[in-house]
Amino acid sequence: MATRSMRAPLRAMLLTASLVALSTPALAQDAAAQDEAAEENTGDIVVVAQGRAQLLADVPVAVSAVSAETLANSGANDIRQLNQVAPSLLVSSTGSEANGSARIRGIGTVGDNPGLESSVAVFIDGVYRSRSGIGLNELGEIERVEVLRGPQGTLGGRNASAGMISIISKRPDFDFGANVEATYGNYDFMRLSGSITGPLSETLAGRIDGVYVRRDGFYTDPQNNTDVNDRNRYFVRGQLLWEPTDALSFRLIGDYTSRDEKCCGAIYVDNTVNEFIGDLNNPSTPLAPLQATGNNIINVLRDLGQPIAGFSPGYDRTLYVSPGRSYAGETTDYGVSLEVNWDLGGANLTSITGYRDYKSGQGSDTDYGRVDVLFRTPSDNAFRQFKTFSQELRLQGEAFDGTLDWLIGAFYADEDLTVQDNLRFGTQYGRFATCRVISGGGLAGLYSPTNPGCVIPGVGPATLAAATGGGQTGTDIANGFALLDTLNNRGSTIDRYFQNSRNWALFTHNIINITDTLDVTLGLRYTNERKRFNATFGNDNTVCTALQGSLTDDLVSPNATARALAGALIGLGCQGNSTAELNGVSIRDSRSEDELTGTAIVSWRPTDDLMVYASYSRGYKAGGFNLDRSALKAPIALVNGVPTSTFAALGGAQALVGNLQFDPELVDAYELGAKYSTREFSLSAALFRQDFSNFQLNTFNGTVFLVQTVNGCSVDNGAADRDLSATTGACAAGDVTYGVRSEGLELEAALTPDPDFRIAAGLTYTNTRYQDSLVGNRLGAPLDPALRMLPGDNLSNAPELVTTASVTWTPELGSSGLSGLFYVDARTTSDFNTGSDLFPQKEQDGFTIVNARIGLRGPDQAWAVELWAQNLFNINYAQVAFNSPFQAGTTAAPFVDPQYPGGRQLFSMFLAEPRTYGITLRGRF
């Protein structure tokens, strides 16, 4: 990374290197039942990455295929655990299970705003899931998972700018079969699963899968006598396969998932975890204007009830939750799909019709500390919901005696997205806000956290009035502190955002066989996207409107202290545009866009075992709306050079609705690759470069979520994009260029010297970096100051080096039919920054995660007993670190040091899962 050298522990690197010397992801089984025999006899791997059943070695694109056996051995129950066997993939979840994010080659959708679509599209049985996090459910019985890297779109479904994860479940079988599985582990983990399949008639077969999971939480909340980040979920999927003729089949799938869980806890980042924290988590002693050591916000939080031990947790998983606050949430996810395949003789027709309904509500102690600053109450009226209908048609065949393998298709989707939010200020917010202002500057001598306005009675108000010039201005400021102190348990009653997305596309993907060894692939896609948006706000924060009414004139006071305090009081009283001025107000907008994307590939097979290829792809991800009222306007805005704070002064909320829009993301991708495959050994390599324009970035700056479409400027702006000004660093529109480049090398290999022994390995080196000069949109507007660390640095959650390795050994034990199982996998990751604003306090050192499984299996694997461990060495690390909401002290010496680009901001982190272990019993009939 630009800010720190790679420091992955040497022993971790050596561990992975030893496995790499032996062995990438275990590769997929057959794409359809009729290919299984061929795979068993030849070792060939069949995928449908190009819309046709092809040998993996014949596919001229970068794709990893993970088999059901490998998924079972690695303990993968959802797509997060694919990280262990796919080095270019990173899947993580943060503030909510619904907000999971997938990244490929360092690129993914950043942040948890549902208005942003996924850079990495997730499909389950050909049906698009609206956001990556929706794919974090239990998967049931899986045939294989394909991970395609690079822009997608010419093969069908929804387009994606970074890649695709395609999950294929096991189909119904016309031979009877059943299996059961029971697992018990630490944290009182219990997982029960099973499936049954078989014929219902000569032409009709069925399958039912079911999973039930429960587990205690990884965090403890002693204040509320509970645990957090637990599991309590179930999943059921039923299928019917009807084959009335050899040429026609219908596959009907219905599934339902329910989750009733508490998620997601976070703890403070301290200087034992990240050296750049320094003294940020120490109280200021004494509490004085310069505060040579420590941080005044620590004094405030401590004095209002946060135990001082909570600021130095290391990796301790004890939460300090506000009394009565809860992380409880409920999620339901269900849908139905129908896949029709019809062999017309000269062509094959495929139709996939799907309907999905996903709804998730989550409470939270949104400040992640004991002091009650922000919260969301678990409620049936607060949720995010996706209702999606999709229809895909593909027609594929051959022409000119097999010279042309053609595919044409169409896709249509209609999606309703509803977000209802009830974020409110906590019962201690008013005192917290006033103390935050009083404690950090020249007025620190008035600090009195047990008194109204956080000032010493009598003396405090008088001193405030005198310090701000006396007269009416002084009275306004003194009264403003008293008024802000009353801002408790106010905010959103219900804010409702609604977005309808209508997307249709035409696509074609054609393979031209120039010679027996040379192919040219040409693909094209036209996409038309229309989005309609409306929102209605409910808010009871009358303190904001009262502060605006009494203090707006003081924003232009000749007294500098009065101006600063008036701005601080209004800003804290109206954080995130939480104001009764919006109560009952509705806004609406719409946008339309269309885009032509495509791919061109040349592949050459000099020998039967070797293929080389070169490709170019143009990718696209739709623009949309920031579903967050905080983006409508800044707390203090200028009108004709005069500061103001109300919506009315700016023409009302509807006049500002354009501030919520963001542009589509575009990518130009280039790739050179080679694939070598024999029965015993396979190796694939790819060199790639991807240039992203309008890179959609969602960042929480400690106060609000902001969305910018990051671009580069071909003219050096003299580091004006790295200062604290929102007005410097503009670029002429004609000089705007791509803002993000991802380039690197991927290697995947597998060695199978014996049917009972397999070793696999993968390596991804990726340099995913922002340009040196950045702007905030395609017109060249300045980059937001909150993003001033981005220019020239690596993207968040984009480690430069990742290696994966696995060893599988299933030896026969004598002649009784018994066999053993030994499986181990490892993933080593170099340093990376987990925060989208790239503050050094969010950096994560490199680490290695090892999973292992040993077992005994009966004849024909009719039964098995397995012992397993995930994260065997109990490695602690952060998935994402973030600015602790509203918890920033006053900037003063020595925090002007570059080590503290966030001033006195505190930071919190979502930890990854600790070591888990247990026993699994399997039975198959």
Model regions and ranges:
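Solvent-exposed loop segments that connect transmembrane elements
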Residues: 218-227, 264-321, 365-380, 422-494, ...
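Outer-membrane beta-barrel translocator/receptor signature
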Residues: 100, 117-119, 131, 140-149, ...
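N-terminal Sec signal peptide and the immediately downstream disordered periplasmic leader
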Residues: 1-74, 79-85, 197, 246-247, ...
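Structural signature of Gram-negative outer-membrane beta-barrels, strongest in the C-terminal barrel
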Residues: 241-243, 409-413, 499-690
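C-terminal beta-signal and adjacent terminal beta-strands/loops
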Residues: 423-424, 430, 756, 827-835, ...
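Acidic, small-polar-rich N-terminal luminal/periplasmic segments of exported/outer-membrane proteins
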Residues: 40-175, 672
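Outer-membrane beta-barrel domain signature, strongest for Gram-negative TonB-dependent receptors
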Residues: 225, 231-406, 413-417, 456-457, ...
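Gram-negative outer-membrane beta-barrel transporters
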Residues: 33, 403, 409, 516-520, ...
